[in-house]
């Protein structure tokens, strides 16, 4: 659906030019929710404007459904923009327009007739759960309600793609969860492809299918969220499910960092490990969650004394284990079994 190919973006000319994106590559499939994550200054907003066709890349291409849109004329670019809806951080509603009038704005610009506009606005406000707020002004709405109006407005022209630029930033956790649930529902009901620009790990973990990490304008990690969560060497995976506490254990205990690596990990694997090794197993810390209906987790365990089969046993149950040695070096289950 969306392909970003070797995109570079510079602002300014000659010796004064500043490169804010460098050779960016990633793709988003139809119906996927993709997150682009990074700290302030990473280039996220510039990338979102390029995907939204509000900026042209200095180099590289943007493809929508296989069509290269980065080199289109301004007229054709305006037509293509109708296929992309954008949700902004502060909802960007017009203060002197009611919720319904804000949602109607893109339809007015597109020349849609009054009766058709009214029907479409009513439909959209109902879809985002604000049918009873149609005549209220932005100042009369909560932050979450204003963002829902912004989402309804972004859907006015029936786009195929939604680009959300920090749409949940500044919202409280409960409101954030409700907005993300709404976006997931819209994806499922309308077949939308959604790109989430965010700096929040929780947003990625809750709704994203794939994620791309930007740092100083470069891609440093990219892939399906569940695969990164299950990769014991993924920095993003550790950030999404952190479990690296400074833990003290008994002198004879051997510590293992364990990462879930498959859909078939037994729920009682700790009990099974204790029985198979004849050792006492302690859980020192951990996080286990369902991500997109699939298990993901990172757990630190202690094993009472040495046992040569711990690594192999963990692997047989779909787990990646990293033994933490006394000198703070570590070896994976594959190394331990070699």
Swiss-Prot record:
SMART domains linked: AAA (SM00382)
GO molecular function terms listed in the Swiss-Prot or TrEMBL record: ABC-type D-methionine transporter activity; ATP binding; ATP hydrolysis activity
Enzyme class label: translocase
Reactions catalysed: L-methionine(out) + ATP + H2O = L-methionine(in) + ADP + phosphate + H(+); D-methionine(out) + ATP + H2O = D-methionine(in) + ADP + phosphate + H(+)
Enzyme Commission code(s) on record: 7.4.2.11
Domain called ABC transporter: residue spans: 2-241
Transmembrane region(s): none
Assembly with partners or alone: The complex is composed of two ATP-binding proteins (MetN), two transmembrane proteins (MetI) and a solute-binding protein (MetQ).
Main function: Part of the ABC transporter complex MetNIQ involved in methionine import. Responsible for energy coupling to the transport system.
Family: Belongs to the ABC transporter superfamily. Methionine importer (TC 3.A.1.24) family.
Protein name, per record: Methionine import ATP-binding protein MetN 1
Species of provenance: Rhodococcus jostii (strain RHA1)
